[in-house]
A protein has these predicted regions:
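Carbohydrate transferase catalytic cores enriched for Leloir-type hexosyltransferases
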Residues: 1-418
Length: 418
């Protein structure tokens, strides 16, 4: 579950009690490999549990209401997420739930069994804290009911906003999700005490909207962390050059450009000189043309689509790649790009502000309209040995953000808030 880059590392002590919202992690059980947002919430769970001297609780919205877990409950929940302990049997409510998968039903049943307190949908359970902070890092459970209930307890509210992409790029969103996202963000703007932004670019977009809604909030900006990469990886054993694209297969990620490039390469190169492309991610929404193209290309020897690759296998695949391809029209933070840079794997990406902020001069920046430049760069890297590429890129890799630095920034901002 935890994948790459969720170990907090050493950070200064957290002197205040915390209620961490774990709704996102609970809702993702049984739904495939963890996403970037999942991994951030998991990193926060690790951090909150790392300080034994102050109270920590977890709040989750599940089918039928809310549950609160104490430290022991959170430790057990984390062990189950990691696969160290099995999920238990589904209880009666889960077995009767027609909208709940078997795995999620088991997870929600365990949450009910582990709960120190429970409530229905209309109000929160009693949280035995009068001082401290509620942390929401998963873009989940951000309703006015939930946040108003938290405010009534006297806790301060700190919300991590990953991006404002649904409002900036509504054309790429599923039907109905833009308004729901705006409702969430308006609740965050009206009821939060602190906003955590993962980049200056995100902070600017959040503040643009929040200022329009009359929310004069303090912000702390801190890049998300990537775990230390000291282990030598047993990389993929395929000797043919290959490239990797990571992320949900949705319109914003612009996989169509990559398919266009590889179709051109197929016409221009002998079969034995064709680089491969691995597309890693679940199929998303509003992308039927790309799905049809992928289906029609299933017999192509140069194309691999992985919809449920685990984190360890993905990390090994990325480590052996000739490059990570990121042709997205917009990105929130882009953890895979940072992880590629940490390994010394080349990155080819669009000319987005977030890439410049975090990666500096490390990537090759290519205009998304310039298919020739993308193809030329891919071919140039294909002709080099992967080890030589990695050696050259490690020498120029940017400063890699750490979770320790991130949590030190958040800790300082929350301490000031209290």
């Amino acid at each position: 579950m935890h994948g790459v880059g969720t170990k907090p590392g050493t950070t200064i002590n957290r002197p205040y009690p915390v209620v961490l919202d774990i709704t996102r992690l609970a809702s993702r059980v049984g739904r495939g490999p963890s996403t970037g947002v999942d991994r951030v919430e998991f990193a926060y769970l690790n951090w909150c549990l790392s300080e034994d001297s102050v109270p920590v609780y977890g709040l989750a919205r599940i089918s039928g209401g809310f549950v609160v877990l104490d430290r022991e409950g959170l430790l057990s929940f984390r062990s189950k997420l990691l696969g160290e302990l099995p999920w238990g049997r589904r209880d009666v409510r889960a077995r009767l739930g027609i909208r709940t998968s078997t795995q999620r039903g088991a997870a929600e049943s365990d949450l009910r069994r582990l709960a120190a307190a429970r409530s229905g949908r209309e109000s929160l359970p009693d949280i035995p804290l009068e001082h401290g902070v509620y942390l929401n890092t998963g873009h989940s459970n951000l309703s006015e009911t939930s946040l108003s209930g938290i405010r009534k307890t006297g806790l301060k509210i700190a919300t991590l906003v990953h991006d404002m992409i649904p409002l900036d790029w509504p054309q790429f969103q599923r039907e109905g999700t833009v308004q729901r996202f705006e409702d969430k963000m308006q609740a965050v703007a009206g009821l939060s005490d602190l906003i955590i932004a993962n980049s200056e670019g995100t902070r600017e977009r959040v503040q643009y909207y929040f200022d329009q809604w009359g929310a004069g909030l303090p912000y702390v900006t801190s890049h998300l962390g990537v775990g230390q990469n000291s282990k030598i990886l047993d990389i993929s054993g395929d000797n043919r050059p290959y490239f990797v694209a990571i992320g949900t297969i949705e319109p914003r990620k612009n996989h169509a450009l990559l398919l266009d490039i590889w179709e051109r390469l197929e016409k221009e190169l002998p079969h034995e000189q064709m680089p491969m492309i691995h597309i890693v991610g679940q199929r998303g929404w509003k992308n039927e043309d790309v799905f049809q193209r992928l289906d029609s290309m299933q017999n192509k020897s140069w194309l691999y689509e992985h919809n449920s690759m685990d984190d360890v296998t993905l990390r090994r695949l990325l480590a052996g790649a000739h490059g990570l391809l990121v042709p997205s029209f917009a990105e929130g933070f882009g953890l895979p790009s940072i992880e590629a840079a940490q390994m010394g794997v080349p990155v080819i990406c669009g000319d987005l502000a977030i890439h410049h902020e975090v990666l500096g001069d490390y990537p090759v920046y290519a205009d998304l309209q310039d298919i020739y430049l993308w193809k030329k760069t891919i071919l140039e890297q294909t002709k080099q040995r992967q080890k030589d590429l990695v050696h050259a890129h490690r020498a120029k890799k940017p400063k890699i953000p750490t979770w320790s630095e991130h949590f030190d920034d958040v800790n300082a901002a929350v301490t000031k808030l209290l």
